[in-house]
Amino acid sequence: MKNLIIYFIIFSSILFSQDQLFVGTRPLGMGGAFTAVADDGNTITWNPAGLPRLRRKEFTSSYADLYAMDITHSYTGIVWPFGDRVAVGFDWSNVGFDDQELNYSDNKLNFSVGYQPFKLLSIGGTFKYISRDMGLDGTSYGKSTGIGYDLGFLISPHKKLRLGLSLYDLGGTDVTYK
């Protein structure tokens, strides 16, 4: 019973975390200050405006056991540049926990497009689909799905200066529980 209470405390923080960014070792190592850098495959999640600045296809993947409590995070992403001004990216992220009593799964699928109309400016947008499921003793206590949108900007006014802005969940991410 004590373990069950601990699991509920942990999962309540995860459930209401509102799409925390656990993506990429480098962005996390930078304390999340990756919005203006946005120069690898993790830019799909952090700032989609970085996509057209990538000059080759990129694939990224990670797996982590968070908090040493069998809460796992899996991530896979791929970016395809089309010329010098446009790139698209897809990624999938899963945070989950599964034991004999309690299970939780949070899946997110992103589709991102980035466009660089000028050398100084690039913009990007992400459409995301979210699916969540929580159960206890084999019984589902909440399934939800929803969609959301993100928008990103990168401005490079100088060779050694880049400014980034990411707007997450524009208009609110609508997640409906069934």
Residue ranges of model-derived segments:
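Positively charged n-region of N-terminal signal peptides that target proteins for export
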Residues: M1-L4, K119
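Subset of outer-membrane beta-barrel
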Residues: Q18-K178
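Sec-dependent N-terminal signal peptides
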Residues: N3-L15
